[in-house]
Structure formats: C-alpha cells, structure tokens
Amino acid sequence: MRVLCLFGLAAALWADGPGVILSHRVKSDFDLTADPNSGVWKGVTGVFAQNGPKGDPTPGHRTEIRSVWTPEHIYFLFIAPYQDLNLKPNPSQDTETNKLWDWDVAEVFAGWDKQNIHRYKEFQVSPQGEWVDLDIDRKTPLPEGGWKWNSGYRVKARIDEKNKIWYGAMRIPMKSIDPRPPKEGNELRINFYRIQGSNPRKFVAWQPTHASSYHVPEAFGTLRLAK
C-alpha cells in the first residue's frame, strides 16, 4: 500500500512537472479581467517564464502565466514585470494590429495536433490592450503570414506603473485552437513568450527554443485541461 501511495504521489507530481501547465476548469465564462487578485484568477497556480529563448537569464522579467477553461473558452493571464516599456503610438483596442511584435507583447503559441506540430495558432496582447492573432503553418505559410485569420478572441490589459508590472489577459474560443470536444485530460502543445523594452529588447520564453526564433514547435511544452 505504501508503495502504491508513493507511486501515486510521484505520478501526480509528474503530471504537473517541468514543461507542463495545468489549465483549471471554472464553472462558467466570466467578464475578462487583467487583475490577478479578482474573482477566478485569485489563487490559480501558474507557471513562470524567466529566461530567454536560448535559456539565458533575463533578470527583472520573471513572468507568471495562469490559465483556466470552460467548454467554450480558454483563458490566460500574464503577470509581466518590466524595466522599461516600448509602446506603439496611437494604439487601437478595436482593430487588429499587425506586426504588434515590433512592440511590447505577451504571446501564446498553441496547437492540438501532435502529428502536425507545424500547424498552430498565435495570440498576442500588448500592455495597451492591442491584439493580433495568426494562423501559423511553418511548412506552407499562409497568405500574409496568416494574420488575417480571426479567432474571435478578446484581450484586456493594464499597466501598474508604480510597481512596473503590466498585466495581459486573453479569452480564446476553444474551437479556434482545438476541434475536439473539450474535456478534462485533453492536451495542447503550447509555449509562452514575451518581447519587452528597447535598447536592448528583452526576450522571454517559457520553454527554450534554443534559437533566435520563437517559431520552434518542437520546443513547445504541454497544457493539460484539469479540474
């Protein structure tokens, strides 16, 4: 019995081990908020991204990512410390901003098909609440890089200038990432990134890509839908 208990404990720890983020089930969809201490977000255990894409330390930019889900949507919250901001002039929260990655952003790259890892979706949010979503095909790139694809996702962001942290939240329709019926235990291939500041720009990756590009699906981690 003791052996079985220890085995069960080890399995539980492994299920939430390195390279794995759990997205926690919530009862129903909710008004999107970028406040980590409000409602659903409070108490959710996330993961941290603190190094560059090649595994090099990025001091002062240790980013927390939290996730929850419903049958209709998957939600993400980025808690993003910064040293300086690099913001696009004249931001628009009402229309998509192509090439938003030229400025400060937090990013989710997510796909479901483990047999076709070159196909995935990209979602970005800026500290000013700008957004862009892209349909990515690394083997046969889509017209204009896939940015004219529209997932129907929503974002919310705010900047805490006093504490030098910005917060970005996303609500993404589940069907825009994964055609399977959502259920506990489903897994996505996923990675999280940031681009921050200027002179020099800072780059943060949850799972290192070991390349200058973020578009290395072989390096993605795992998101698991949990209770």
Where are these regions (language model features)?
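Sec-dependent signal peptide recognition
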Residues: 1-7
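Hydrophobic h-region of N-terminal signal peptides that target proteins for export
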Residues: 7-15
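Structural preference for beta-rich elements and adjacent junctions enriched in aromatics
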Residues: 15-227
